[in-house]
Design a protein with these regions (language model features):
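Cytosolic covalent-transfer regions centered on His/Cys nucleophiles
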Residues: 1-123
Length: 123
């Protein structure tokens, strides 16, 4: 699995301007949907928000990786977004997140999201 196989040009947004964490998640969900990776955007976003309730995916150093497994996902995929002004994503270091990678995996897809996180970490 390669990052370039998971990330389509239509799922990338530079100079985004979400104001809140929820805005950022909705914007990334829209990018994921534009890439053709979702069968049910609302179901996927519900899973992402549920995942965020268990703990923020704001990693620190300006990076966030919101993700979820969901029946609303057709295939494993990525969406990417740059937010120059940053968004408070409740990161461990308290700094705003500026670089976002949203990870989508189909429900029951073993550890696909973990594999994608691992690949992102080595970039």
């Amino acid at each position: 699995m390669k990052i370039t196989d998971l990330l389509k040009p239509q799922s990338i947004l530079l100079n985004a301007d979400p104001v809140t964490k929820a805005d950022a998640i909705y914007t990334l969900g829209e990018l994921m949907d534009k890439g053709g990776h979702l069968t049910d955007k609302a179901e996927y976003l519900k899973a992402v928000f549920a995942r965020e309730e268990s703990g923020s995916t704001g990693l620190g150093d300006g990076i966030a990786t919101p993700h979820a497994k969901s029946v609303g996902v057709k295939e494993a995929a990525l969406a990417a977004m740059v937010v120059p002004n940053g968004v408070d994503f409740e990161a461990l270091d308290g700094q705003p997140s500026r670089l976002f990678f949203m990870i989508a995996a189909p429900e029951g897809a073993a550890d696909t999201h973990v594999e994608v996180l691992s690949k992102l970490a080595t970039m």
